[in-house]
Amino acid sequence: MPTELRDFLMLPYGELEELNLEAKEQRKNRVAADKLQEQRLKYLSDESRIKAVTVLFSDLEGRLHMLDYDKKFLLKSADNLTFDGSSIRGFTPQRESDLRLKLDWGAFYWGPADIFGPGKVLVFGDVLDRDGSPFSADIRGVLKKLSSDQYEQNGYTLNAANEIEGFVFAGVDAEQTFHQTGKFDYVNTGGYYHSLPGDPLRTFIDTVA
C-alpha cells in the first residue's frame, strides 16, 4: 500500500533532458505560438500528476522571480494573470502597481523535482503593462522582440544564454544567520581549479552539473 497521499510528477534526469530538448527543438523550428499553447494546455490538463505551474520572469537586473499557481486555477485564468509590479525594484510605483503576465508557452520547461519540488512544471511569462502592451522594463521581452524583428527583417537568428557565476558560502542556511555573524564564510578560498574530489566545493559542482 503506497504511503504517499498524492502521486506527484517526479521525472528522472534522463527523461527531463529528453522533454526539454524536444521543447527546444520546437523553439528552434519556430512552431506557431497558438499551436504550442494548445499542446501545453492539453498536456497540463491530461497530466494528473502535475499540481502547480511555476511562472517565471526577470527584473531589470536579471534577477529571476517565480510565482506558483495551482494548475486548475492557471488552466482557467491563463489569460488573466496579474502581479504587483511595485514589489519589483525598478518596475512600477505603488499607485500604478498592477502588471500582467502573458505566458510564453515556447519557454515551457520540466524542472528537477529535487530542486523545484514534485508535481511542478515551469513556464516563463512576458510582462505586460495594464493596457496589455509590452512592459518596457521587461528586458527579456525586449530581447525577444529584438530577436523576432531581426529574424523577420534580415533572416538573422540571435542566440543568447546565461553564464552562471557566483559564490558558494558555507552552510545551507548561511543567509539566515548573517544578521548575527555579519559575514559569509566561503566554502573554499582556493577556487574551483584547486578543489579536490570530495571537498564541499567539488561536491557542490558535481551535484549541480
Which residues make up each language-model segment?
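ATP/Mg2+-dependent ligation/transfer catalytic cores
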Residues: 1-209
